[in-house]
Amino acid sequence: MPQRMPPSSRHPRHPRGTHRQGGIALFVVLVFVMLSMLLALWASRTSLFNEMVVGNDADYQRATEAAQALLQDAELDIRGERADGGMCTGTAPVCRQGSVATMPVEAKDVANLLADLETVSTGPRCKNGLCLKRTGNQDFWNESDANTGLAAMQAVGTRYGTYTGAKVGDDDAPANPILRNTAAGQGGWYWIEVLPYTPDAANASLIAGGNANYLAVNVQPNVIYRVTAMAQGRKDSTRVVLQQTYVRHRLKD
């Protein structure tokens, strides 16, 4: 009589010595994914930081160039010249024509200009970018006083090309964007302090034990100009201030 075979199991048995996966592969994958995300985040933050550094440096360099251009414009304003060395020509207020304060040419002009600036009763004693010697703190760009601080000085400062006719560029010939920006509190300005000195300085001994005329000067009138130029960058945190002393030395006849 034939023997009946037992029914085969639908679920085969695992051979002895083998083990089922306990989820370690998934854990390893998650760890690598998290590490990849951290590396990507670090790379993006590094790139953003480098971009900020480069952007800040570019803005500072642009503001420095604008301040240097303002100093040169102030020198031309003092000499009454154009950038090519020719005499200043144009319509008011270019070349300080019209009812604006003018550069002194003779000694009497110095006295008249200083007397006119003395009549300013409120705020900085300045007119059209010409100022008396500042008293007190010299770094007005760091002051918050409404009457003598930066905001008050900006109101009496001179923009690039106002009295020299220098062009700030256009779309076809772009110039420094800071110089083109004339919005309130933006762009650049310069101020010229008129500092008279005694004519006896020309014959004074400038170096102890030196000759009386060790440095012969021929200045008419006897005035030194202290020029301060300030350029506000495209970012609020960028500001460049340059200052120089300028003496217009005249050739003897």
Q: What are these model-predicted stretches?
A:
Residues 2-6, 11, 16-253:
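Terminal alpha-helical segments
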